[in-house]
C-alpha cells in the first residue's frame, strides 16, 4: 500500500500539492535526478533530453496537463525565430515578431486576464459578466516572458536563432527557473547549453550555500511568520491594534522577500549544481536609499526585462522628461498588472511608477547624476523612507480589497497603542525572533555573506552534507501542516 501511494504521489498531479523545491518529494527526486544527470555527463544531447523531460514532468506536477502550453510556446517561437532570421524584408520581420507577441500575450491574457477584463468592462458599461472557470497555469507569466525575450532579441539581431528545437526546449523549460523565475535571458543562457559539463568546487559550494539559505528563508522564516502571524493580521486587521497591524506589515515585507528570494536562491543554486550560471535576482533590496535603487535590487530579472523590452520600446528617456515620467508610470502599471489580474496589483504598480517618476524629477531638480550614492546620515534616512514607502505599497499588494487596506491604515494611524508591544512580543516571541533574525541577515554587510559562502565552499563533502541535512531537519520541525506554495507561483 505504501509503495502504491508513493508511486501515485510521484506520477499523478495534485492541484492541492504542486511540486515545489521545499517539498520532500522534490528533494528525494532531485537526488535520483542528479545520479542520472552525472551518468550522462559526457553525452550532451542525451543529458539535454533527460533534463528537458524532467522539466516537463516538473511542470506537469505543478499544472497538470497544461504542460502542453509550454510545448506550444516553445515550438511556435522556435520556428518564428528561424523564419524571422531568414527574412530580409523589414515589415515581414516585424510581422513575425508581432505573431510571437500575439501568441504569448494572447495565451497570457486568456488564462490570466479574461475574467478581470470581462468584469471591468461590465462594471464600466453597467452590464453583467459571468465569471468563467479558467485555470491559471503556474508560472505562465515567467515562461512567456522568457520566450518573448528570445524572439525579440532575434528580431533586434542581438542573437542568432538556435538550430536545435531540443536546445530551445531546454532553454524555455529548464526546471530551476520554470515556474517562478528568475526570467533568464537567451543571450546569457544559450551559450551555456552545449558547453562541456563542468562544476567547480566553488560552483558546488556556492550552489549548496544558496540552496540551504534559500530553503531556510522560505521554509523556516517566510512560512512560519506567515502562518503564525502575518495571515492573521491581514485577514482581520480591524481586530488588532495599530502596532499589531504595523508589525504585520513589517512581517509581510520580510515574508514576501524571503519567499521570493528564497526560491530564486534555490533556483540559482540548483542551476549551479547542474553547471549553469544564472544572474542574481535579489540584492538586499531593503538596503535601498531610493525607490530607483530598490528596483535595481528587487526582482532584477523582471525589472530589467520591463526596462529592456517595454520602457525602452516606449521611448525610455530619449523623448524628453515628461515622456520619460509617463513611460515609467506606464511600465510600472503594466508591471503591476503582470503580477495579477486585480486592481490591487495595478494600484501597487502605479504607486511605484509615480514614485519612480517623482524620484527622477527630484534628481533633475537637484542636479544629482544617475549612480550618485548618498552616504552617512543621508543614506540612513533614505533607506528608512524607502523601506517604509515599500511597506506602505505592500499593504495594497497583499490585500485584494481596497477597503481592507484602508482599514489597516486606519488602525495604524488611529489606534496604535504602543504600550501593547511588549505583550505582543511575549505572545509571539518565536515569530518576532525569526523576524529579527530575517532582517538581521538581510542588513548584514555583503562581505559577511561572501565570507559565509567561502566557508561553505571550503567545507569537505561530508560537512556540506551535514549542513544540508541540518537545514532539512529544521524545515521538517518547523513546517506547518500544509506545504505553503511560493507566493510568486500565482503570477
Language-model regions, residue ranges each:
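Short, small-residue-biased leader/transition segments that mark boundaries at the very start
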Residues: 1-3
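Membrane-embedded transmembrane alpha-helical bundles that form the catalytic cores
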Residues: 5-490
Amino acid at each position: 500500500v505504501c509503495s502504491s501511494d508513493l508511486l501515485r504521489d510521484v506520477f499523478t498531479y495534485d492541484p492541492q500539492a504542486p511540486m515545489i523545491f521545499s517539498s520532500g518529494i522534490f528533494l528525494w527526486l532531485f537526488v535520483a535526478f542528479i545520479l542520472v544527470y552525472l551518468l550522462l555527463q559526457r553525452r550532451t544531447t542525451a543529458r539535454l533530453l533527460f533534463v528537458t523531460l524532467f522539466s516537463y514532468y516538473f511542470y506537469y506536477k505543478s499544472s497538470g496537463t497544461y504542460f502542453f502550453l509550454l510545448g506550444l510556446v516553445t515550438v511556435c517561437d522556435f520556428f518564428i525565430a528561424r523564419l524571422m532570421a531568414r527574412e530580409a524584408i523589414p515589415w515581414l520581420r516585424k510581422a513575425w515578431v508581432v505573431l510571437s507577441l500575439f501568441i504569448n500575450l494572447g495565451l497570457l491574457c486568456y488564462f490570466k486576464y479574461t475574467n478581470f477584463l470581462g468584469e471591468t468592462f461590465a462594471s464600466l458599461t453597467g452590464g453583467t459578466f459571468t465569471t468563467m472557470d479558467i485555470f491559471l497555469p503556474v508560472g505562465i507569466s515567467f515562461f512567456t516572458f522568457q520566450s518573448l525575450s528570445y524572439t525579440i532579441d532575434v528580431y533586434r539581431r542581438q542573437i542568432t536563432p538556435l538550430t536545435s528545437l531540443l536546445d530551445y526546449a531546454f532553454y524555455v523549460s529548464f526546471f530551476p527557473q520554470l515556474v517562478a523565475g528568475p526570467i533568464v535571458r537567451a543571450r546569457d543562457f544559450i551559450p551555456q547549453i552545449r558547453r562541456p559539463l563542468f562544476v567547480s568546487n566553488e560552483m558546488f559550494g556556492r550552489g549548496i550555500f544558496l540552496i540551504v539559505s534559500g530553503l531556510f528563508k522560505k521554509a523556516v522564516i517566510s512560512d512560519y511568520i506567515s502562518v503564525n502571524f502575518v495571515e492573521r493580521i491581514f485577514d482581520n486587521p480591524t481586530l488588532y491594534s495599530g502596532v499589531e497591524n504595523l508589525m504585520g506589515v513589517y512581517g509581510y515585507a520580510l515574508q514576501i522577500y524571503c519567499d521570493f528570494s528564497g526560491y530564486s536562491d534555490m533556483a540559482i543554486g540548483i542551476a549551479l549544481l547542474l553547471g549553469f550560471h544564472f544572474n542574481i535576482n535579489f540584492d538586499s533590496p531593503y538596503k535601498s536609499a531610493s525607490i530607483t535603487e530598490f528596483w535595481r535590487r528587487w526582482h532584477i530579472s523582471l525589472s530589467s526585462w520591463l526596462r529592456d523590452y517595454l520602457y525602452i520600446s516606449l521611448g525610455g528617456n530619449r523623448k524628453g522628461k515628461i515622456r520619460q515620467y509617463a513611460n515609467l508610470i506606464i511600465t510600472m502599471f503594466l508591471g503591476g498588472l503582470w503580477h495579477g489580474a486585480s486592481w490591487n496589483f495595478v494600484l501597487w504598480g502605479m504607486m511605484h511608477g509615480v514614485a519612480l517618476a517623482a524620484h527622477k524629477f527630484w534628481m533633475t531638480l537637484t542636479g544629482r547624476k544617475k549612480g550618485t550614492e548618498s552616504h552617512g546620515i543621508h543614506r540612513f534616512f533614505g533607506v528608512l523612507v524607502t523601506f517604509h514607502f515599500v511597506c506602505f505599497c505592500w499593504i495594497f499588494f497583499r490585500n485584494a480589497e481596497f477597503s481592507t487596506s484602508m482599514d489597516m491604515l486606519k488602525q495604524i494611524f488611529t489606534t496604535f497603542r504602543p504600550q501593547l508591544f511588549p505583550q505582543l512580543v511575549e505572545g509571539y516571541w518565536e515569530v518576532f525572533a525569526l523576524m529579527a533574525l530575517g532582517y538581521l541577515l538581510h542588513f548584514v554587510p555583503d562581505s559577511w555573506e561572501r565570507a559565509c559562502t567561502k566557508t561553505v565552499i571550503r567545507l569537505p563533502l561530508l560537512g556540506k552534507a551535514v549542513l544540508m541535512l541540518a537545514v532539512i531537519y529544521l524545515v521538517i520541525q518547523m513546517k506547518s501542516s500544509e506545504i505553503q506554495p511560493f507566493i510568486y507561483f500565482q503570477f
